[in-house]
A protein has these predicted regions:
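Short, small/acidic-rich helices and loops at N termini and domain boundaries
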Residues: 1, 28-95, 250-286
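Conserved active-site segments centered on acidic
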Residues: 1-36
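Phosphate-handling DNA/RNA-contact segment within nucleic-acid enzymes
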Residues: 3-12, 16, 58-199
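Generic alpha-helical secondary structure signal
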Residues: 14, 18, 31-35, 45, ...
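Generic secondary-structure boundary/loop-capping signal
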Residues: 21-24, 39, 44, 49, ...
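Conserved short loop/turn motifs at secondary-structure junctions
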Residues: 21-25, 51-55, 213
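TOPRIM fold recognition
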Residues: 119, 149-155, 161-289
Length: 289
């Protein structure tokens, strides 16, 4: 029987941030990945601000540059060290999606793979000698893009940092979108509720995917998320955009393309009718007191 490889404890958040930012500064975004993000509705400016970067074909030059800067990869999920040399636990083609905590620190990264059944996975080195396991974390986005969570703004909750970023940008950057890794991340959601309560948030909008209509497991998981929020005095309301579009990002992308119109579209002229939606109107959730 194969023995389990020793796994290191993760560095403190501020040290993870230092390493991840140093790594991302050495990487670039391939044209095909930039085009993928632009098709999702993001501008070049927004893509650059959120530090999306492509997986390098070779890590050797990255590690050589960072070694000169004294960067250590011990205790950093996604990396491991063997015989004094650093290695990345993944080399499949894709791009990195940084996860930012409430203090604007990068504390983890997901990879969006170009191919495969599972397109999104945590960048983790669990299972490697002196590797480090990635834990489920919530992403709050970066201040230059995502409004700060506090009691004065309506907070939305969805799954996936990329989806949250797109929804925030395409809806006008008016409200913060927090991203869980998935609807089953109950411990992660409880930690998030502790934070939300501490900054005066008492109500959040559930912007999880519309597949709840056909998936009982998703519905049951959402019920548990609602129950956890209630324990912290936080109520939740569903943002219901129907089932034509699976994710809130898909919905807002359709809005930006004119495939569906938001309600209360002003008339261009006094005697001109407001444009008719291709699909039914989906109401905004009003901000609660």
């Amino acid at each position: 029987k194969r023995e389990l490889a020793p796994v290191l404890e993760a560095k403190p958040d501020e040290e993870l941030d230092k390493v991840y930012r140093a790594v991302l500064n050495e990487l670039t975004l391939k044209p095909e990945h930039r085009e993928n993000l632009k098709k999702r509705g993001l501008s070049d400016e927004m893509i650059d601000k959120c530090l999306y970067r492509s997986m390098p074909e070779r890590w050797s030059s990255v590690f050589a540059a960072l070694k000169k800067k004294g960067i250590s990869f011990k205790g950093v999920p996604g990396f491991y060290e063997k015989n004094g040399k650093a290695f990345a636990a993944c080399s499949k083609a894709g791009f990195f999606i940084p996860y930012f905590n409430s203090r604007n620190e990068i504390v983890g990264m997901q990879i969006r793979f170009d191919k495969g059944d599972k397109r999104y996975l945590w960048f983790s080195s669990s299972g490697y000698d002196n590797g480090c396991s990635a834990r489920n974390i919530a992403s709050y986005g970066i201040p230059s893009v995502m409004p700060k969570c506090d009691g004065t703004k309506t907070v939305y909750i969805t799954e996936g940092a990329l989806k949250a970023h797109i929804a925030c940008v395409l809806s006008g950057n008016h409200n913060p979108y927090i991203a869980l890794a998935g609807v089953n991340c109950f411990n992660q959601w409880e930690e998030t509720c502790v934070y939300l309560k501490s900054v005066g948030v008492t109500h959040v909008i559930d912007a999880f995917d519309s597949d709840r209509e056909s998936n009982e497991h998703v519905r049951n998981a959402l019920k548990k998320l609602y129950a956890i929020a209630a324990r912290y005095g936080i109520s939740m309301t569903r943002f219901n955009w129907g089932t034509t579009y699976k994710g809130v990002d898909d919905y807002y992308l359709a809005v930006s393309r004119g495939e569906v119109f938001l309600p209360f579209v002003p008339k261009k002229k006094p005697d001109e009718e407001a444009p008719k939606p291709v699909t039914k109107f989906v109401p905004f959730i009003p901000k609660t007191a």
